[in-house]
Amino acid sequence: MRSIDIHDHVKGRSIYLDDIPLIQGTLFARVFTSNVAHGRIIKLDISKARDLEGVHKVLISSDITGINQIGGIIDDEPLMAENIVDFIGMPIALVLADSESIARKACKLIDCKIEAFEEITDPRIAYEKGALIIPSKKFILGDTESTWSSCSHIFEGKADINGQEHLYIETQGAYAQPVEGGKIKVYSSTQGPTAVQRAVAKVTGMEMHSIEVDVTRIGGGFGGKEDQANAWAALCALGTHITGRPVKYSLSREEDIYMTGKRHPYSADFKIGFDNKLKILAYEVTFFQNAGAAADLSPAVLERTLFHCTNAYFIPNVIAI
């Protein structure tokens, strides 16, 4: 099947976020982020950054005009840190400046001290400590307990699957523009424009019908530009809502890699039983999903894990947790 877009792609005619002509007066955004995985902010001084020539605003969580929350399934993901930081790369302050270079320079002038807390990066440890993001779910089919005695062969073990960077060619980004009547138009490189619209409405305090989200092209997504695209659109829209000027933020590759979520690492304990013809009779598995600092779409991914865990086989007796 031929792609209807292929000719525009190979001839360079496809319009991506960075190909959109800039409106005069556009401000460029950069975020100052946490260098600690988990901790409390004990000092935050933005005065030097704010006073730098070419800087128009330095926004922190208290400047948010709506709700400091972009969580999709669960409201557990602040757009900017208030007192607690939850991951390395968590936005603490948003700089709006005349150029990207000035915005970067301003970020280096922000003085922040963070008291580090214990960090939990292993979901098995989180389970032991009762620190799961959501309660465990269970999928049951048949009766495994009464089936083990009928199995000629039983294998038990542990499997580990590493995470994965989506590594889309076009990095995350957004471009917000003011529209007459106090409305905002947001260009976003997203797989979920409605999710972006909802997040922008939360953060700005605006009605959803006052926010238009436009997607020109997505330079690759692979699941990495679903809810992960929301933060950058919300930050740009917040900047536009407060300043009345267009705001653009295109993440560098370095920023994208350390500030955005990945495909989940998994660890699993399994027990599987076969009859003497090697037909699978029973299967028990406990999955430990590393969801990172916030739920994002992890609950839905976990449900798919449970429903798909038997793969192409029909196994009459299953317990999946």
Question: Residues of each region from the PLM?
Answer:
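Flexible, low-hydrophobicity surface segments
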Residues: M1-P135, I154-G157, I242, H308
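Gly/Pro-rich active-site capping loops and adjacent beta-alpha segments
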Residues: I102-T121, V196, D256-I321
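Alpha-helical support elements that line or immediately flank enzyme active sites
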Residues: V31-L59, L94-K113, A174-T216, G223-T243, ...
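Glycine-rich and small/hydrophobic secondary-structure elements
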Residues: D76-I102, G223-F274
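Short coil/turn connectors at secondary-structure junctions
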Residues: G25-F28, E53-H56, E82, G89-I92, ...
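Flexible hinge/switch segments at interdomain interfaces of large molecular machines
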Residues: Y16-L27, L167-Q172, N317-I321
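Helix-loop-helix junctions that connect adjacent transmembrane helices in secondary transporters/permeases
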Residues: R124-T204
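Beta-strand segments within the central parallel beta-sheet cores of soluble alpha/beta enzyme folds
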Residues: I60-S61, S210-T216, G244-E254, L281-T286, ...
